[in-house]
Amino acid sequence: MAWWKAWVEQEGVSVKGSPHFNPDPDAETLYKAMKGIGTNEQAIIDVLTKRSNAQRQQIAKSFKAQFGKDLIETLKSELSGKFERLIIALMYPPYRYEAKELYDAMKGIGTKEGVIIEILASRTKNQLQEIMKAYEEDYGSNLEEDIKADTSGYLERILVCLLQGSRDDLSGYVDPGLALQDAQDLYAAGEKICGTDEMKFITILCTRSATHLMRVFEEYEKIANKSIEDSIKSETHGSLEEAMLTVVKCTRNLHGYFAERLYFAMKGAGTLDGTLIRNIVSRSEIDLNLIKNQFKKMYGKTLSSMIMEDTSGDYKNALLNLVGSDL
């Protein structure tokens, strides 16, 4: 499946919102849930996880109009920990949320390259343009310039190349001659020589459409007698290897890529809550149902069953509401 198709597959939406929506009573319910001593977390879960993002924005406006308070700030003052992080993530408009995730990945000491790679490799050109716009509006800074300042070398090159969103081609047309040439160029840039021409890999992986790349990967395997993934693993390392492999995974099976991200966020000791929250929130109104199907196929268990094993309390209940039934 081409990596961009998930953006137009409505059957994938797990959070559809309320069909008979009125923001005013919802805002009142939230106000009462946080008024006085103690907080009614279940009431907050029932409202915010069962509304679409657009509906949540209307609730926030109604909350401000009725009670003179900012809903996000009020939620922050009443909630804490992972549950707070999840609920606040739900309140951001999608592009602003992803801009915030990118900003947080780069601010302070150290850079969370994995977050940047995940977002840039899996979004469409239009989505990336909206994220860049939101980033500039919210942080008064240019996303591309910040990435350049925060990364270096070939990782910087591939991230900037991905940010330009040159891979979109909805026509599905593939030039067999060019696909073969690209496969030969990749082989010549890696397996055939001592050392690696990283820029050749970056140029082809970041500027060709998904349908074209699928053909390139087929041709490459015939020439090299190994998969493109195996060659990337032997020719590169670290964050550059992760970025290239992510592009390949998103090209081959976008839903499989997100299923893998969710699985490894929960597998083993500890939980990568940032990865879990980001991927469930950001895909809930796009293709989370399709990701759930892929998750079950790949790992032999449901996403919700793994969430139940790995999380607890209000945090668990809110996540399960967003994921929906996947028995």
Swiss-Prot record:
The keyword NAD does not apply. Keywords: Annexin, Blood coagulation, Calcium, Calcium/phospholipid-binding, Hemostasis, Metal-binding, Repeat. GO terms for biological process: blood coagulation; endosomal transport; endosome organization. GO terms for molecular function: calcium ion binding; calcium-dependent phospholipid binding; phosphatidylserine binding. One of its GO terms (cellular component) is sarcolemma. It holds the Pfam family Annexin. Coiled coil: none annotated. Annexin repeats lie at residues 21-92, 93-164, 177-249, 253-324. Ca(2+) binds at M266, G268, G270, D310. It comes from the Eukaryota. PANTHER family: ANNEXIN (PTHR10502), ANNEXIN A8-RELATED (PTHR10502:SF133). A pair of annexin repeats may form one binding site for calcium and phospholipid. This protein is an anticoagulant protein that acts as an indirect inhibitor of the thromboplastin-specific complex, which is involved in the blood coagulation cascade. Belongs to the annexin family. This is Annexin A8. It comes from Bos taurus. The gene is ANXA8.
